[in-house]
Swiss-Prot record:
It comes from Streptococcus pneumoniae (strain CGSP14). GO terms for cellular component: tRNA methyltransferase complex. This is tRNA (guanine-N(7)-)-methyltransferase. The keyword tRNA processing applies. It catalyses: guanosine(46) in tRNA + S-adenosyl-L-methionine = N(7)-methylguanosine(46) in tRNA + S-adenosyl-L-homocysteine. Pfam families: Methyltransf_4 (PF02390). Residues 124-129 are annotated as: Interaction with RNA. It is an enzyme of class 2 (transferase).
Length: 211
């Protein structure tokens, strides 16, 4: 989702170093120091305007959250939500999330969220899908043994592809939801996309996969 450039976005991000980590390369292997505790660290790749990551941080104060997005203006809106939520257990990264080993040491994070990632439906773009095996290689490195990926999408094709990709990689599927909002799953925090699609009656798919 491309968002129109927001005037003052850079200044807003720079004015809130308690939430926005600008020296991200120096943060590698030091995230627990930045949070000031040893609580688990959960990362959302492609956090958009921040509804999910800020909502999760508010819902789970004993877990540290990191939201990543490549778009500066989008991340500034995520910062708005973080400030509104009044939470301290969250950091935001304005970076390209294609290689998370640039920002995280091996085993440094405890869970990864992939929400409504670009489906890249054309076969020639398969390697760009975040559930493609080369991305799974990267995710496995930064997660601990038995680390989990929690994945949500409205795109059935991407969901089916991801189930196969996880399984072929040798991952264990701990939970599969073919219609999340019609299930008894508790504690779901919606993204902006999820709210939009749900309002249109679209089915939301979810899976928890463990390395």
């Amino acid at each position: 989702m491309r968002v129109r450039n927001r005037k003052g976005a850079t200044e807003l991000l720079e004015a809130n170093p308690q939430y926005v980590v600008l020296n991200f390369l120096e943060a590698k292997a030091k995230w627990r120091d930045l949070f000031g505790n040893d609580n688990p660290i959960h990362v959302e790749v492609g956090s958009g305007k921040g509804a999910f990551v800020s909502g999760m941080a508010k819902q789970n104060p004993d877990i540290n959250y990191i939201g990543i997005d490549i778009q500066k203006s989008v991340l500034s809106y995520a910062l708005d939500k973080v400030l509104e939520a009044g939470v301290s257990n969250i950091k935001l990264l304005w970076v390209d999330g294609s290689d998370l080993t640039d920002y995280f040491e091996d085993g440094e994070i405890d869970r990864l969220y992939l929400n409504f990632s670009d489906p890249w439906p054309k076969k020639r773009h398969e390697k760009r899908r975040l559930t493609y095996k080369t991305f799974l290689d990267t995710f496995k490195r930064i997660l601990p043994e038995n680390g989990e990926i929690h994945f949500k999408t409205d795109n059935r094709g991407l969901f089916e592809y991801s189930l196969v990709s996880f399984s072929q990689y040798g991952m264990k599927l701990n939970g599969v939801w073919l219609d999340l909002h019609a299930s008894d799953f508790e504690g779901n925090v919606m993204t902006e996309y999820e709210q939009k699609f749900s309002n249109k009656g679209q089915v939301i798919y979810r899976v928890e996969a463990e390395f």
